[in-house]
A protein has these predicted regions:
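Residues that define the transmembrane beta-barrel architecture of outer-membrane proteins
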Residues: 1-3, 67-71, 109-113, 150-154, ...
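Outer membrane beta-barrel
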Residues: 1-95, 109-111, 118-122, 160, ...
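Outer-membrane beta-barrel architecture
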Residues: 16, 82-84, 125-131, 164-166, ...
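Outer-membrane beta-barrel pore domains and translocons
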Residues: 22-24, 67, 88-92, 120, ...
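Outer-membrane beta-barrel proteins
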Residues: 28-31, 85, 94-99, 139-143, ...
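Flexible, surface-exposed loop regions and adjacent strand-edge segments
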Residues: 35-40, 104, 184-189, 230-231, ...
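Detector for outer-membrane/organellar transmembrane beta-barrel domains
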Residues: 115-236
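Outer-membrane beta-barrel "beta-signal"
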Residues: 240, 268-280
Length: 280
């Protein structure tokens, strides 16, 4: 499955229009500025990510949901003294599908709407990148006994770079969403309950090396695993650049799930990973 397959049209005066498949806008800067994005991140037996059951998650689910690539038409304004605005019409997501019934069908009467506003500026020799993003959609069902789900979310954050030091803080608040994937992977039957999270990170570059510290947490009232739970990831990573294309990585992280209503969800997983990141 191709994550990104799109075309763009635009110019410096009026901006750019993207049409095709790309990452969503809600949570976009949250994940793209994750210090562990090119590392390993968390794994979980509960989430089916151990022993080849899936890929490692970075900080997905512990600080932000994954802005899953989706078909869209998105407009991005030109940069206006550091300010840029993006707004998109996205393929909506089934959040009201009852897999226990053969007669119901989730449907949406309107597309999913997402937006992101970013602002870059310099203050006292420090480079700042700030953002706020959001989404809204509604999903209904042909079975009138299944309640309509109105989903909405807000993401935000700031990154400050001072020489070789980088500090990033981000977070999100949402209702009626899957706290792991914005496309509600697996099409779970969601409810209009809350989820929120934050991610705090710092990194320092010295020579060809970069060390990063990370702590992320998501509190979910039950849309993730069907029962309220808190999810946390603590991590430290060392990156060593061989050249512009190859980076060696060593990472240690700890992932925890704490069920609020039942201890059966409780999990603690520690992972040490080494590897290489190749880009071209």
């Amino acid at each position: 499955d191709v994550r990104q397959f799109y075309a763009t049209a635009g110019n410096e005066q009026w901006g750019e229009v993207l049409f095709g498949k790309d990452f969503g806008l809600f949570g976009r800067s949250n994940i793209l500025l994750d210090e562990l994005l090119s590392g390993y991140g968390q794994v979980s037996d509960t989430l089916g990510l151990v022993d080849g059951g899936g890929v490692s998650f970075g900080n997905i689910g512990t600080g932000y949901p994954y802005p899953f690539p989706t078909s869209q038409i998105t407009y991005r304004s030109p940069k206006m003294n550091g300010l840029r605005i993006a707004a998109g019409v996205m393929d909506p997501v089934d959040t009201t599908e009852d897999t226990d019934s053969d007669i119901d069908k989730a449907y949406q009467e309107a597309p999913r709407f997402e937006t992101e506003v970013t602002y870059e500026f310099e203050l006292g020799g420090t480079q700042f990148y700030t953002w706020i993003n959001g989404m809204q959609q509604s999903s209904d069902n042909t079975d009138s006994s299944i309640e309509k789900v109105d989903s909405k979310g807000l993401g935000y954050g700031v990154q400050a770079k001072m020489g070789n030091l980088s500090l990033t803080a981000s977070g999100f608040q949402a209702e009626g969403i899957n706290p792991f994937f914005t496309n509600n992977a697996g099409e779970a039957l969601l409810r209009e309950v809350d989820s929120d999270g934050y991610l705090l990170q710092g990194s320092y570059r010295f020579g060809k090396n970069r060390v990063a510290l990370s702590y992320g947490k998501t509190k979910d009232d039950g849309n993730g695993l069907g029962s309220a739970a808190d999810y946390e990831t603590r991590g430290i990573a060392l990156f060593h650049s061989i050249n512009d294309n190859l980076t060696l990585v060593a990472e240690l992280n700890q992932f925890e799930i704490e069920g609020r209503d039942t201890p059966t969800l409780d999990e603690e997983t520690r992972t040490f990973a080494v590897g290489a990141a190749l880009s071209f």
